[in-house]
Amino acid sequence: MDVRSIEDVAPVVEHNGTVPVWWLVNPREMFDITKGGHLELVSEFEVAGGGLVDPHHHPTHEFYYVTAGRGIMEIEGETREIRQGDLVHIPPMAMHSLRPVTDNASIHCFCFAVATPDADAINYTEH
């Protein structure tokens, strides 16, 4: 499971020494695997305590960046706790789900997806 945390990356000072940047995905690092694709979506979502994003898959590279809370991420049968500052890469067609670690607290994420060149339109409301 590809999970990257700002806690594991040293910031690089950019913009004339005024802005620390934590590169969770280095420039062009995913060029080959996303080549020919397009930006499918950008969203923000919250899974309430006791909630669950049911297992599902998409023909996209999907990325979740945790902005608040903690959750249990499962991708293709591998389970890992994720928390604020983590970036999760979900490969195309990988079965995945997410739930908060407790029934009393939510997890809040920023999400974006890059579709593969041959991907059909996706109806996200069905998931």
Mark where each language-model region is.
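A short beta-strand-loop-beta hairpin characteristic of the jelly-roll/cupin
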Residues: 52, 56-84, 94
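A short, N-terminal "cap"/entry segment at the start of jelly-roll beta-barrel domains
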Residues: 1-38, 123-127
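A structure-centric signal for secondary-structure junctions around beta-strands
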Residues: 39-41, 60, 106-107
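Short glycine/proline-enriched turns and hinge-like loops at secondary-structure junctions
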Residues: 36-37, 57-58, 102-103
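Ligand-binding loop in jelly-roll beta-barrel domains
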Residues: 83-84, 92-119
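Short, charged/polar surface micro-motifs in flexible loops or helix N-caps
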Residues: 39, 47-50, 70, 115-118
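Conserved short histidine dyad/triad with adjacent acidic residue
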Residues: 25-31, 42-58, 92
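Conserved hydrophobic/aromatic beta-strand scaffold that supports enzyme active sites
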Residues: 23, 42-46, 63, 79, ...
